Amino acid sequence: MNLTDKTVLITGGASGIGYAAVQAFLGQQANVVVADIDEAQGEAMVRKENNDRLHFVQTDITDEAACQHAVESAVHTFGGLDVLINNAGIEIVAPIHEMELSDWNKVLQVNLTGMFLMSKHALKHMLAAGKGNIINTCSVGGLVAWPDIPAYNASKGGVLQLTKSMAVDYAKHQIRVNCVCPGIIDTPLNEKSFLENNEGTLEEIKKEKAKVNPLLRLGKPEEIANVMLFLASDLSSYMTGSAITADGGYTAQ
């Protein structure tokens, strides 16, 4: 896949899809920098992986200075930045008439503004290099509306359009920008949400959730990481502004 010695910066890389991406890119001999708000989890990940190609920087992506520092840390540690994966995201379950403004703002700040801030500072280095690759984690919620998470859906719709806008604006600089739209993935974040917002055991809830798509199962984090590998590699060299759906057939129904 020609990813050896490429430097990849992944936000939200300490767990779930992000951590699967970390492992996938390390497996391709890439250098990986993880920017995550959870310092304890990030440091535990570094100890577990025990790989000189992995670096962690504690980052709140709603803070522009922190985003700039994360990008500069990647450049300083490994000598450049080839791929940015904007993966960090949150979800708050609440219908519009019950949602607090602070919760609405929090979801948009993390899921959309954080992506803008990370991209802004990564693009400066990519423009100087004359090439680059940005991969955004969107969601099926950016294509169709999941019930009871309007702020999340709105933020992911914004991610889809931000992806296309950046793709159009930076194609002439040989910077590709694409996104992946996962369906329901078996992650710690989703497990927490399942238990907080549904009746029954975790196993029972997962079985019910799996029924919504034709493959009749939840997705695995590594299955989304594999899409990211493809988008980061030369195998997708003619793709920019694209949204790859990996949802077990949910949106095909």
Swiss-Prot record:
InterPro entries: NAD(P)-bd_dom_sf (IPR036291), Sc_DH/Rdtase_CS (IPR020904), SDR_fam (IPR002347)
Family, similarity comment: Belongs to the short-chain dehydrogenases/reductases (SDR) family.
Protein name: Dihydroanticapsin 7-dehydrogenase
Reactions performed catalytically: L-dihydroanticapsin + NAD(+) = L-anticapsin + NADH + H(+)
One of the GO BP terms on file: antibiotic biosynthetic process
Function: Part of the bacABCDEFG operon responsible for the biosynthesis of bacilysin, an irreversible inactivator of the glutaminase domain of glucosamine synthetase. Catalyzes the dehydrogenation of the C7-hydroxyl group in the 4S-tetrahydrotyrosine (4S-H4Tyr) to yield anticapsin (epoxycyclohexanonyl-Ala). It is not able to oxidize the 4R-H4Tyr diastereomer and the dihydrobacilysin dipeptide (L-Ala-4S-H4Tyr dipeptide).
Active-site residue list: Y152
Biological or metabolic pathway of the protein: Antibiotic biosynthesis; bacilysin biosynthesis
GO MF annotations, alphabetized: oxidoreductase activity
Top-level taxon of origin: Bacteria
Amino-acid biosynthesis listed as a keyword: no
Gene disruption: observed consequences: Cells lacking this gene show an accumulation of dihydroanticapsin and dihydrobacilysin.
Induction / repression: The compound guanosine 5'-diphosphate 3'-diphosphate (ppGpp) is essential for the transcription of the bacABCDE operon and GTP regulates the transcription of both this operon and ywfH via the CodY-mediated regulation system.
Annotated EC: 1.1.1.385
Keywords: Antibiotic biosynthesis, NAD, Oxidoreductase
Enzyme category, top tier: oxidoreductase
Listed NCBIfam families: anticapsin_BacC, PRK07231.1
Residues noted as binding NAD(+) in the record, renumbered to the chain: 9-31
